[in-house]
């Protein structure tokens, strides 16, 4: 799924759409996405000048966006908004810097009605960069 198709599912737009491609989707179960981390990312000018590092919370947001693609691919949730409700047990294992390609893997581990939990892992190559639980709710239809 390319960037245009992702925008057909998620309402996020530049500069806050943090997923460039979705490589795999199992509706309601899991998705795998990719973020090509460019030296031109808006956040690098201040995080940190001279030693750019992708903020960990934005890695988690990217994982949440990939999870939202899996969730909103279910027929009953199409056209709705996925709301990021929180994070638990988050760990940052490796810095993500310009030139890295992030592989974003998010699994939906619990779904009850329109509320649930996912688990996300972000990799650079085979190296784990970040992981944690993602809490979410599915909102109303987007008009």
From Swiss-Prot:
| Membership in a protein family | Belongs to the thioester dehydratase family. FabZ subfamily.
The protein's name: 3-hydroxyacyl-[acyl-carrier-protein] dehydratase FabZ
Enumerate the Gene Ontology biological process terms.
Answer: fatty acid biosynthetic process; lipid A biosynthetic process
Q: Quote the InterPro entries the UniProt record gives.
A: FabA_FabZ (IPR013114), FabZ (IPR010084), HotDog_dom_sf (IPR029069)
Identify the catalytic residues: 47
* NCBIfam families registered for this protein in UniProt: fabZ, PRK00006.1
User: Matching HAMAP family, A to Z?
Assistant: FabZ
């Amino acid at each position: 799924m390319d960037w245009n198709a992702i925008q057909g599912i998620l309402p996020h737009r530049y500069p806050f759409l943090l997923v460039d491609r979705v490589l795999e989707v199992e509706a309601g179960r899991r998705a795998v996405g990719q973020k090509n981390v460019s030296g031109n990312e808006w956040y690098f000018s201040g995080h940190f000048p001279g030693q750019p590092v992708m903020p960990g919370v934005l890695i988690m947001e990217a994982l949440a966006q990939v999870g939202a693609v899996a969730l909103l691919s279910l027929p009953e949730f199409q056209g709705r908004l996925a709301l990021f409700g929180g994070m638990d047990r988050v760990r940052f294992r490796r810095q993500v810097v310009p030139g890295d390609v992030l592989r974003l893997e998010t699994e939906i581990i619990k779904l009850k009605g329109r509320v649930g939990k996912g688990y996300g892992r972000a990799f650079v190559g085979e190296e784990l960069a970040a992981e944690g639980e993602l809490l979410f709710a599915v909102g109303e239809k987007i008009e």
